[in-house]
Amino acid sequence: MNIKEAKEEIKHTLLAYNRKDVAGRYTFPRLRQRPILLMGPPGIGKTAVMEQVAEECGVGLVAYTITHHTRQSAVGLPRIVTRCYNGKEVSITEYTLSEIIASVYDCMERTGKKEGILFIDEINCVSETLAPTMLQFLQNKTFGSHSVPEGWLIAAAGNPPEYNKSVREFDIVTLDRVRRMDIEADLDVWMEYAWKKEIHGSILAYLGMKKDHFYSVENTVDGKFFVTARGWEDLSEILKAYEELGVEITENLIGEYLCRDEIARSYFASYQLYRKYGEDYGLKRLLSGEMAEEEQQKKVKMAEGASFEERFLVTGLLLSGLNGSFLDYEKLDKETGAVYQELLHLKAFLHDKKDMTALDEFTDVKKKSLAVRLEAELLNLEQQTTEEFVIRTLEEFSLTIRKEHITDTETGFERIRQLFTEMVEKRKDCAKKISRELERAFAFMKACFGDGQETVLFVTGLTRNSHAAAFIREYGCDPYFACSEKLLYRKQEKKLQEECESLLKI
């Protein structure tokens, strides 16, 4: 299965294991709660998917790379205690609480989340002294004499033997107590993730052309050569940072992330062309409507006579440019929605207040609440950014109220309502701007490539992009729907032709 399918399966498992009856007791037998074992090549997102599941399900996450641990840190340290057996006092050995189990309790105390995921990475690469402990952990859900708390799903990940010489094979007894999921690299699934994560446009365009360059791991007598999903994502971040700083991108830099010479060389050439075509075609000005009609016609002729690679890179540039606009709108939409929800609370808060100084009290409460949730690690970066925007907006509202000498709550809230209406209008203007950009992009694609494979790639790129799909679902886009219908008709026609051909062969 691919990593997306594995993610859904983990979410379903978490829900199943943590079902409760009316008395609040867990209904799934603890003995039958098999740990999940993800097996797959390195760098395909096994660790990242655990973070996503924990965040989306609102549970805690404790992650360990077990190769960094000794038997003592996993099981606990021995200590001598006195016990009385059959009237005779004896000294016996007990173990302190495992560092890993202690981390689970720390997470519960820090975040207030009583349920979660305990994730152990590289579990099949443990040292010889720790191997029996890991088998006990998978079979009995314990480290030493200490059990994993109820409500916590055990998940582990490892690499197949062909990727890691340190791998220890699990026996049948152990495998019969876990849910093994074999994960494979899948470019289509990663591309959906890539649009969400704003992966560099040159990478998306390149992988659209060279699908077989997405993932490659090879061990030869000359050394190890590999390109992974993690490598592409990390490369994207350094490219964006270097471009903002004006630092030159070199082939050596690419080779530090894509450890296979022919792929690094091929991508570097494509990256240079991507930057060059971005300047030559001026697609930012085209999307914004700043490009004159005569200049547009020149760009159309340039694209009509372009090579296969140039056509695909131009399509990638258009998709990347639109994605930036979709992200801007999505951020604005979330911020506007968050402010709206806060104003509903503010209205109730001001109901029995005498004057608008209560707005500052309300804002202070918000600040304290944010600080508590940040300390408990209950917010991700995106949620934190939105919360901070809401607080800044409330402070701006308060400043405007004071500047205009408004004191009574009724007049003050009405003024805030007017200020919020301006925010809503700004969001509407942003949506209209993006709709026009979409129309210009489709018009350019149609003029350059008609209904060719480049247009198919363009429509497919929008469909896979969750930001684009959400925007089009809300505001519509006639050219997109028209092209999608044509593509669907073509698929149905091709399927019918294949069925007819198969019948004729009978």
Regions inferred by a protein language model and the residue ranges of each:
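Helix N-terminus capping/helix-initiation residues
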Residues: 2, 98, 171, 186, ...
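Context-gated lysine
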Residues: 4-7, 11, 20, 32, ...
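Exposed alpha-helical structural elements
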Residues: 5, 9, 103, 189, ...
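Generic hydrophobic, helix-prone segments enriched in Leu/Val/Ile
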Residues: 10, 100-104, 242, 434, ...
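Sequence-level detector for tyrosine residue identity
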Residues: 17, 26, 64, 85, ...
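Alpha-helical lid/collar subdomain of P-loop NTPases
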Residues: 196-360
